[in-house]
Curated annotation (Swiss-Prot):
Encoding gene, per UniProt annotation: nthA
Organism: Rhodococcus erythropolis
Top EC class of this enzyme: lyase
Necessary cofactors: Fe(3+)
Family: Belongs to the nitrile hydratase subunit alpha family.
Cited Pfam families: NHase_alpha
Keywords tagged on the record: Iron, Lyase, Metal-binding, Oxidation
Positions with a binding annotation for Fe(3+): 110, 113-115
The protein's name: Nitrile hydratase subunit alpha
Entry EC number(s): 4.2.1.84
Xref: Gene3D superfamilies: Nitrile hydratase alpha /Thiocyanate hydrolase gamma
Positions where Cysteine sulfenic acid (-SOH) occurs in the chain: 115
Cofactor comment: Binds 1 Fe(3+) ion per subunit.
Post-translational modification note: Oxidation on Cys-113 is essential for the activity. Oxidation on Cys-115 stabilizes the Fe-NO ligand coordinated in the inactive form.
């Protein structure tokens, strides 16, 4: 009788449990040793799901559109402007706002990982974390934006800002025509996370 040995799996890495299972096992081990304070996990869950939100960034943009003094502060010292609202925190210690103009479109990327200004943009979208976006937007931003549904005219410069270990960026988009007389609350509704990253432009709803 002959025996065939499959050598293809000899050096294969052992199968791993899903990340969620491993995380839960780690939590139970730490909790069993009394190393997890009461409410600690729930507190962070609330922070990530409710507090870290692009609604905060939209609030900053809406005020900048309607308050020239705040706009100037946001552009010269974004950290101080955000601190007025108490929106600082992890991944938001040093914030820089970059302004779109009729001749300039700004876009944010983190080419090394997926950092964003969590306190005012929320957690990064899946596409933002993808290698394809991180690799391509720095080389061909106009094409990438077009593929995402945002057409930028050829005579408009596109400037890409790469997040660093210290600096987190947000885009201050241009205020759309047709929003004259809108309240800050109304303006906030048209500013999305994609607008704050720079891959989309605020749109006025059509009736």
């Amino acid at each position: 009788m002959s025996v065939t040995i499959d050598h293809t799996t000899e050096n294969a890495a052992p199968a791993q449990a899903p990340v969620s299972d491993r995380a839960w096992a780690l939590f139970r081990a730490l909790d069993g040793k009394g190393l997890v304070p009461d409410g600690y996990v729930e507190g962070w869950k609330k922070t990530f799901e409710e507090d870290f939100s692009p609604r905060r960034g939209a609030e900053l943009v809406a005020r900048a559109w309607t308050d020239p003094e705040f706009r100037q502060l946001l552009l010269t010292d974004g950290t101080a402007a955000v601190a007025q609202y108490g929106y600082l925190g992890p991944q938001g210690e040093y914030i820089v706002a970059v302004e779109d103009t009729p001749t300039l479109k700004n876009v944010i990327v983190c080419s090394l990982c997926s950092c964003t200004a969590w306190p005012i943009l929320g957690l990064p979208p899946t596409w933002y974390k993808s290698f394809e976006y991180r690799a391509r937007v720095v080389r061909e931003p106009r094409k990438v934006l077009s593929e995402m549904g945002t057409e930028i005219a050829s005579d408009i410069e596109i400037r890409v800002y790469d997040t660093t270990a210290e600096t987190r960026y947000m885009v201050l988009p241009q205020r759309p025509a047709g929003t004259e007389g809108w309240s800050q609350e109304q303006l906030q509704e048209i500013v999305t996370k994609d607008c704050l990253i720079g891959v989309a432009i605020p749109q006025v709803p059509t009736v």
